[in-house]
Amino acid sequence: MKEEETTYHVPVLLKESVDAMNISPDGTYVDVTFGGGGHSREILSRLGDGGRLLGFDQDEDAERNIVNDPHFTFVRSNFRYLHNFLRYHDIGEVDAILADLGVSSHHFDDSERGFSFRFDGKLDMRMNKRAGITAADVVNTYEEERLADIFYLYGELKNSRKLASVIVKARTGQKIETIGEFLEIIKPLFGREREKKELAKIFQALRIEVNQEMEALKEMLMAATEALKPGGRLVVITYHSLEDRMVKNIMKTGNVEGKTTQDFFGNLQTPFRLVNNKVIVPDEDEITRNPRSRSAKLRIAEKK
């Protein structure tokens, strides 16, 4: 494993996820979350002369990890545009699509990116540094009710309305620009025993809103459903309940809402067959080596 790969992000469930893709040497594959390139390198190691891999990442920092391989094409884009770029590269159907939905260690460990409450720095949280609103924009400009909804829906925080009220009151005196300033405002709401867990939920909610993660995931999953050929695999690693619910729904019902449809005879209509009825999780050895993998869940579905 290359040094830049391990410092940028340690690939989670590497063997399990790539095995699940059922790689054929001459197949066409997509890694929609390239990141440190760990999964992509493993996929490429299994391809032959006719094989092809597209790797997506919207973060310009990921470009430092680009694989020098004639079978690999890097796409600097949000994976929500999967359909567009498959057409652009003249790819009809693909054999498997892999998505590791975890935030790269690089993002959490880079204080300038603003993803972690462990460091002071700007309230940013953008995956794509060239576009979109920042976390500071959210906490300084959103109406109180909208802020509360974000914390409730994306962070599953029970005190979301109190949290939003405190933030709105604080920003009337001075704009909230740094993580340190933000923590001073919200930390008094939590006891020491709950502090880390609650802060993690708050930062997750802001990150999801800033990057429109749920909307992007929905669009990618729908595009993946269309792009896979019969027998093709959708392989997804999730880390929190919101994204896991969406992935589980599309694999079971063919839509992210989980609405079931039946044919004339009452049989469930779905584009997928579940490969693993029980989620695959990291073993104790992997969690020891990479504690950030502890919440990972691997789901696999095969296109009918």
Swiss-Prot record:
NCBIfam families: 16S rRNA (cytosine(1402)-N(4))-methyltransferase RsmH. S-adenosyl-L-methionine binds at G37, G38, H39, D57, F79, D100, H107. It catalyses: cytidine(1402) in 16S rRNA + S-adenosyl-L-methionine = N(4)-methylcytidine(1402) in 16S rRNA + S-adenosyl-L-homocysteine + H(+). The keyword rRNA processing applies. Belongs to the methyltransferase superfamily. RsmH family. GO terms for cellular component: cytoplasm. Its EC number is 2.1.1.199. GO terms for biological process: rRNA base methylation. This is Ribosomal RNA small subunit methyltransferase H. The keyword Nucleotide-binding does not apply. It is found in: Cytoplasm. One of its GO terms (molecular function) is rRNA (cytosine-N4-)-methyltransferase activity. It comes from Bacteroides fragilis (strain ATCC 25285 / DSM 2151 / CCUG 4856 / JCM 11019 / LMG 10263 / NCTC 9343 / Onslow / VPI 2553 / EN-2). Its main location: cytoplasm.
